[in-house]
Each structure stands twice: as C-alpha cells, then as structure tokens.
C-alpha cells in the first residue's frame, strides 16, 4: 500500500489516510487541542509533499507521520504564542451543522474521549509517550527516537503515566 501511494495511487494514499488519520487526530487532540484539525491538515500536506521521497517500512512510515505531526504542532504552538487570540464569537460559525447521527457518534466515542481526557491530565511528557505507544502503535525505540530520549526514559515515562492513570481511576472508581 505504501509503495503504491508513493507511485501516485490515489486509492492507496486514501487508504493510508483512512488508516492513519483517526490515531493522528487522537494524538493531536491531546498535544495540540486547540488546533488538532489544522495541524492534522498541515501534517497530511507535508506527507503528500514528501511521500515519494520516503524510504522505509510501514512502521517507519507511521513514525514519520507522527514525527511530522509533532513538529507541525510545535510550529503551531509557536505561531499561536506570537499572535493575539480572536474572541470566541468571531471564530464560531453562526449555526453549527448537525448530522442525524451526531448523537450516535458522540455515544460511540464517549469512552475514547474520557480516556484521552485522562491522558491529557498527565504531565506532558508522560501523555505524549502513552499516546505514541498506545494510540499511534509505535514501539519503544521508535518513540525514543521521535522524542529524542532514551528507550529507558520512554519506558519509565510510560510506566509512571500508566501508574498515575490507574491511581486516578481507582480514586474515582471509574471504568472506561
């Protein structure tokens, strides 16, 4: 599939997008909540531009996708810190579109939203490690390279983050 997308197959690229975008958005909603969709769009634009030159495996491609997203999120955070925020009323449309299945979709994703919310409450480095390991499905060594840390530091951050999540859930007597 990756090779076909690199050769210009729209069907193959569409499949890469369908397979990768949900996890990418879940990751970005935690590390860049105010701009997740914008950062995802920038990420995919960068992927389109660089896909033909990418050399590696499917797992390497996932790592490249999330590395690109992380860099775009950092760029967006810098950009936002330099410009004043618009008033909320200016950014919202006057009427939000409603889909007949919106309620069903909301119910379907309630557990995912709760879990992501809990992960977002962790220290940033622990949350990012957990998201890259669990949501993105990357291995320890890949996450370590992506974040510029040692595999041991990644394991420790994941362990501490998961232990903290377990404590939060035990205190609240919550099941996801």
Walk through the language-model features, giving the residues of each:
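Short, charged helix-capping/linker segments at alpha-helix termini
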Residues: 6-15, 25-42, 55, 176
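Amphipathic, Lys/Arg- and hydrophobic-enriched alpha-helical face
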Residues: 16-34, 50, 119, 171
């Amino acid at each position: 599939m990756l090779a076909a997308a690199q050769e210009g197959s729209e069907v193959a690229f569409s499949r890469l997008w369908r397979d990768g975008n949900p996890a990418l958005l879940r990751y970005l909603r935690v590390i860049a909540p105010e701009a997740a969709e914008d950062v995802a769009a920038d990420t995919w634009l960068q992927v389109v531009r660089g896909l033909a030159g990418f050399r590696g495996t499917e797992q390497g491609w996932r790592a490249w996708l999330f590395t690109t997203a992380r860099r775009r999120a950092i760029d967006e955070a810098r950009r936002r810190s330099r410009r004043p925020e618009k008033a909320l009323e200016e950014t919202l449309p006057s009427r939000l579109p409603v889909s007949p299945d919106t309620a069903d979709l909301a119910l379907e994703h309630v557990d995912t939203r709760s879990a992501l919310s809990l992960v977002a409450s962790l220290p940033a480095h622990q949350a990012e490690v957990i998201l890259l390991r669990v949501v993105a499905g990357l291995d320890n060594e890949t996450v370590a390279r992506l974040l510029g840390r040692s595999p041991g530091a990644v394991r420790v951050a994941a362990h501490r983050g998961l232990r903290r999540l377990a404590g939060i859930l035990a205190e609240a007597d919550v099941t996801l």
